[in-house]
């Protein structure tokens, strides 16, 4: 078994995550970035766009919305961990049938508490489908009005849980925003059957999810994949065993981990001689892909990144390890970026940070100013 140093592990993961410079000729379309990562968490659309920015070259924020609303090569719906994601549209044919039943079952008790029994859910979803087919896109409030017209009165938190169920069953997804408000559309109308990809058997879908996970996050473990996907560990273990001939076992921090055999050549490549510095946004997938973050976040600063409540703050990443946080303020056509490092930054890292801040402003189409606060 090959034993990897922490630096080697972080270097491999950075490359898998598209956080190293892309080789000449590499495809950097929005859809390709999303597919390579097997989804990008997107409960905050601006943060999801910035996750794409940091993994591409030359794209701008408008390209992300164009890919979602006009080209429809990516779709915003509920996916991994039961949270909103940008997913490659061509992956929906196997991802939704794989993930949906697990999260629908996991939400059963909460639906019951909210008065959403199976009969109500089935009747309400039929009404939603008809309403969107005839009048969509519709906002949540407009959907609630349509339900009321059919004698189905849904209040409070029952509303998002009903829409969540409808999305996990593959009936609906998010459509174009209307005056900064979310709208919903019929998935079949929005993307068309031919664009959602082919379904897979349950076993094949689990195996594909494992390959895609390791493609973006390896070296890693089944426990890491289970935490990232929200799928049962037993199913994940079975999937790993089914593709064992495609994996290499390595040692990470004294414990076994795995990566794809197709990535074996990466083990012989040295880490970059210059620092790789990235400004990761809130909820970036680099920090969501593992059971623990000890390799990427210094333990004494963990609460600076995640103080609780599921919030992951924007981070400064230096060679795969979080070296601080950052925040930005939008002032008309100006972006003010403030970096809060954990320790003093060397000049070379500061120079890379300036390049990142400049590219962030380019992506957003604004001018920028940035400064580094004293370490704390």
Where are these predicted regions, by residue range?
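Long, low-complexity intrinsically disordered regions
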Residues: 1-294, 298-376
């Amino acid at each position: 078994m090959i034993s990897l140093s922490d630096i080697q592990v972080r270097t491999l993961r950075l490359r898998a995550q598209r956080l190293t410079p892309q080789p000449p000729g590499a495809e950097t379309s929005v859809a390709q970035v999303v597919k390579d990562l097997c989804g990008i968490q997107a409960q905050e659309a601006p943060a999801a766009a910035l996750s794409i920015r940091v993994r591409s070259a030359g794209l701008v924020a408008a390209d992300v919305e164009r890919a979602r609303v006009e080209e429809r090569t990516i779709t915003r719906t509920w996916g991994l961990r039961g949270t909103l994601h940008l997913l490659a549209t061509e992956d929906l044919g196997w991802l939704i049938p794989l993930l949906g039943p697990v999260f629908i079952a996991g939400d059963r008790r909460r639906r019951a508490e909210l008065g959403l029994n199976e009969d109500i859910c089935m009747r309400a979803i039929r009404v939603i489908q008809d309403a969107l087919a005839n009048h969509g896109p519709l906002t949540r409030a407009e959907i609630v009005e349509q339900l009321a017209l059919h004698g189905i009165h849904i209040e409070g938190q029952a509303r998002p849980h009903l829409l969540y169920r409808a999305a996990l069953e593959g009936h609906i997804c998010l459509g174009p925003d209307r005056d900064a408000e979310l709208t919903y559309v019929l998935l079949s109308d929005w993307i068309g059957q031919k664009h959602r990809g082919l379904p897979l058997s349950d076993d094949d879908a689990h195996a594909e999810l494992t390959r895609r996970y390791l493609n973006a996050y390896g070296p890693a473990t089944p426990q890491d994949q289970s935490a990232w996907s929200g799928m049962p560990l037993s199913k994940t273990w079975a999937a790993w065993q089914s593709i064992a001939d495609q994996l290499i076992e390595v040692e990470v921090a004294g414990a076994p981990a795995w990566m794809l055999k197709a990535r074996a050549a990466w083990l012989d490549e040295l880490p970059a001689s210059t620092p790789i510095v990235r400004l990761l946004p809130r909820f970036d997938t680099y920090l969501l892909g593992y059971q623990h973050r000890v390799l990427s976040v210094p333990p004494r600063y963990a609460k600076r990144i995640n103080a609780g409540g599921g919030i992951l703050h924007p981070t400064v990443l230096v060679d795969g390890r979080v070296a601080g946080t950052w925040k930005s303020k939008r002032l008309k056509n100006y972006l003010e970026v403030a970096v809060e490092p954990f320790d003093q930054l060397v000049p070379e890292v500061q120079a890379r940070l300036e390049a990142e801040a400049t590219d962030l402003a380019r992506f957003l189409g604004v001018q920028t100013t940035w400064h580094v606060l004293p370490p704390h």
